[in-house]
């Protein structure tokens, strides 16, 4: 389902352009930016930077927002993971007059009866996006690997849960989080995505899988 989205010949659908930004939390992690418009990811893949301090990340984000605008594309929402260092990044960008919104994926889901937290809901929205089979993503090996590696858990309380990042790190065989995939799922926290209808995760899947996507 994921790799098919690289080769698929689809009509690009216009709509709001959303930027999702995952902020590195530990030394081995990268900060990542994903720009998505409706059914496709814009550009050559997920942009990543490693080893940046808070102010360097702020400058990088500011530059990338301007680069997108210079290409004639207006970004409607900039969504930043606000856990840990991300909170400082959000505060600084807001101080500079840049319109961004912090997203805490650890908080409660908007559908609390179905999802363990917002992170689980966003991953499920990402899965629904791919399941439509009309999406297009760049050839980004890191993104594909990360999307395929994250597993869902089978909770006793009936709420969908996504495995802890440490488990994903072990599966990936590298001391890094699924930063590229996290940047993509943040785009589904946009106001447009959060107000569209959703299919319950409890409905039968087309194929049996341990993964989310």
Task: Label every model-predicted segment.
Residues 1-21, 35, 157-159:
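ATPase catalytic-site recognition across NTP-hydrolyzing enzymes
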Residues 11-13, 27, 72, 177:
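Short, flexible hinge/linker loops that cap or flank conserved catalytic cores
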Residues 16, 31, 76, 181:
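Residue-level detector of short, conserved catalytic/binding motifs and their immediate flanks
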Residues 20-21, 141-204:
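Charge-patterned, long linear interaction tracts outside catalytic cores
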Residues 22-24, 83, 106, 184:
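Anionic group-transfer/hydrolysis microenvironments
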Residues 25-32:
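Short, flexible loop/turn motifs enriched in small residues
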Residues 30, 89-91, 195:
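Short glycine-/acidic-enriched loop or helix-start segments at secondary-structure transitions
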Residues 35-159, 205-213:
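Mg2+-dependent endonuclease catalytic cores in nucleic-acid-processing enzymes, primarily RNase H-like
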């Amino acid at each position: 389902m994921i790799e098919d989205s690289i080769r698929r010949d689809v009509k690009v659908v216009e709509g709001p352009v959303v930027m999702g930004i995952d902020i590195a939390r530990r030394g081995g992690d990268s900060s990542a930016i994903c720009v998505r418009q409706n059914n496709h990811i814009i550009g050559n893949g997920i942009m990543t930077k490693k080893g940046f301090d808070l102010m360097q990340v702020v400058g990088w984000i500011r530059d990338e927002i301007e680069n997108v605008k210079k290409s004639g594309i207006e970004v409607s929402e900039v969504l930043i993971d606000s856990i840990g260092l991300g909170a400082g990044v959000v505060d600084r960008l807001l101080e500079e007059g840049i319109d961004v919104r912090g997203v805490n994926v650890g908080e409660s889901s908007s559908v609390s009866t179905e999802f363990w937290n917002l992170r689980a809901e966003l991953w499920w929205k990402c899965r629904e996006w791919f399941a439509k089979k009309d999406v297009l993503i760049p050839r980004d090996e890191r993104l594909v690997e990360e999307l395929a590696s994250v597993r869902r858990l089978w909770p006793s309380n009936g709420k969908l849960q996504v495995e802890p990042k440490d488990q994903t790190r072990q599966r990936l065989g590298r001391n890094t989080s699924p930063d590229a995939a996290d940047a993509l799922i943040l785009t589904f926290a946009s106001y447009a995505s959060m107000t569209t209808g959703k299919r319950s995760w409890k409905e039968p899947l087309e194929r049996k899988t341990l993964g989310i996507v």
